[in-house]
A protein has these predicted regions:
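Well-ordered secondary-structure scaffolds
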Residues: 1-215
Length: 215
């Protein structure tokens, strides 16, 4: 966590450290976020649903009995066994679809296609080390331009376009770590500040799953 609070599309999320702080934040119709890597708070708060949105492509320990409604995003979960519902995260016809038996589509490792560009859009760290950014999100970059350094090793733009994603400056990355992505749609500057079509679709699927579970 790098910020104490952040706002996306008029919805503010606030970092909290206690249940009391979380309740106070939610009373203001804001989102409370708590750092809890071991999930210790799950058994300490009253909740109707648990959503595993880690997107690790595998189940890191979520079980179906953790909440009245348990939801897993993407591959790694078996609906009806690990969780009650799986939400499809693969771009395409089934994105956001609810799965009540079985699994989501397996991870292909291939980024979604935008204007004919797929693998070229994503930049991975050429080595392990500390990231030192030269460019920032929203910058227009040209193919071959240096966007960052890993220690002293330069990282080059894989294509020309809008720098839509970039790992935090000072982050310690491993070799091959996904650290940036470029959008060929240079005129869609606002995409850097708004919820993506994919995230909105998956979020809608989560909401549908919760409402269906409560009905």
């Amino acid at each position: 966590m790098y910020e104490g609070k952040f706002t996306v599309e008029d919805m503010m999320c606030v970092l909290v450290s206690t249940i009391e702080e979380a309740k106070a934040v939610m009373a203001k119709n804001q989102v409370a976020m708590m750092v809890d890597p071991n999930g210790e708070m799950i058994s300490k708060i009253e909740h109707i649903a648990l959503v595993d949105a880690i997107l690790a492509k595998k189940n890191l320990g979520t079980t179906i009995d953790m909440a009245p409604i348990t939801i897993g995003l993407g591959p790694g979960f078996c609906a009806g066994k690990d969780v009650h519902v799986v939400v499809e995260t693969m771009r395409g016809h089934n994105l956001g679809r609810l799965i009540y038996q079985g699994h989501a589509l397996p991870n292909t490792g291939v980024p979604g296609n935008i204007k004919g560009y797929s693998k070229e859009r994503v930049i991975h760290s050429p080595c392990a080390g500390v990231c030192h950014n030269v460019k920032k999100i929203t910058d227009i970059v040209e193919k071959g331009e240096i966007i960052a350094y890993i220690d002293k090793t330069p990282v080059y733009a894989s294509m020309s376009g809008l720098l839509r994603g970039l790992i935090q400056d000072g982050y310690n990355v491993t070799s091959g770590f996904k650290m940036a992505d470029i959008d060929p749609r240079v005129d869609e500057y606002q995409n850097c500040f708004t919820i993506s079509d994919k995230a909105r679709c998956i979020g809608g699927g989560v909401l549908e799953a919760i409402l269906h579970g409560l009905s």
